[in-house]
Swiss-Prot record:
It is found in: Cell membrane. It comes from Bacillus subtilis (strain 168). Its main location: membrane. The chain crosses the membrane at residues 4-22, 49-71, 91-108. Keywords: Cell membrane, Membrane, Transmembrane, Transmembrane helix. It comes from the Bacteria. This is Uncharacterized protein YwrE. The lineage of its organism: Bacteria, Bacillati, Bacillota, Bacilli, Bacillales.
Length: 111
């Protein structure tokens, strides 16, 4: 369990560093810490997934569920941002995050 949180911290650090690099390379303007949903439907999909995540915490291990939650949420964000706001290129941030979380999930599942 402790290894998981250490790996999660490393993944977050790598994600932040890669976001900084992507922001510089592609000139992406990411303003603020709060995420802005593409549409009202997108917002409600994420709220529904968050509610499902909270209810399923008692049935599944937190490590797997947390990683799956981030993978699903970021995958939805990739699609919505790519489909509705491709000129912003913000979906590139989420591609990096999904890749890191997927690698972390594979590592945790093999333990």
């Amino acid at each position: 369990m402790t290894n998981f949180w250490i790996l999660m911290l490393i993944a977050i650090t790598i994600s932040l560093a890669s976001q900084f690099f992507i922001k510089k390379k592609y000139g992406i303007d990411k303003s603020g810490w709060r995420y802005k949903h593409v549409s009202n439907t997108h917002k409600w999909i994420e709220i529904t997934l968050l509610i499902l995540f909270v209810f399923s915490l008692s049935f599944f291990p937190v490590e797997y569920l947390l990683l799956l939650f981030f993978i699903v949420i970021d995958s939805i964000r990739i699609f919505m941002e790519w489909h509705y706001r491709p000129e912003d290129k913000q979906y590139m941030y989420h591609i990096v995050e999904v890749s890191l979380m997927f690698m972390l999930l594979i590592y945790v599942c093999t333990l």
